Amino acid sequence: MTLLFAQTAWLVPLYPLVASLLSLLWSPGVISRTGPRPCGYINLLMGTLAFVHSAVALVALHSNSTAGSSAIYRPLTFGWTWLDTAGLRIGFDGLITEPALVAMTVITGLHVLVQIYSIAYLEMDWGWPRFFGSLSFFEAGLCALVLT
């Protein structure tokens, strides 16, 4: 079951990306009845999900690599082809390795801590959607950069 988390570790950058897109709903004029606070809590929830997914994937990949020595040298790969025509291939390829998952776990863990601190620090501020959307978009970019 936990190996499934390692095989789907490419989904980890999508959690903060979805959170940053959901933050747009709390932009001024779209949702004004609830105020900006739910935006921060949704970003914290999605960041925590990304952290848990990357931590479980790291544990699963580490226990899989210690099961056999040949598994260490075979990282999980994924790819997505956007355009493939006349010898031109434009796509997105990535490797899920143990160092990449360690870096992604550190990134998402620090992001959760920054989110908790920011919720307390920005208590009376109305700029939550812009701040938390930018923060989650930055985290999604860092996690995607680690995987490629």
Q: Residues of each region from the PLM?
A:
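Transmembrane helix-loop-helix hairpins at membrane boundaries of multipass inner-membrane proteins
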Residues: 1-10, 14, 26-133
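Extended, highly charged clamp/arch subdomains and adjacent linkers
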Residues: 17
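Alpha-helical transmembrane segments of multipass membrane proteins
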Residues: 21-25, 116, 140-147
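Transmembrane helix interruption/hinge and helix-loop junction motifs
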Residues: 98-99, 146-148
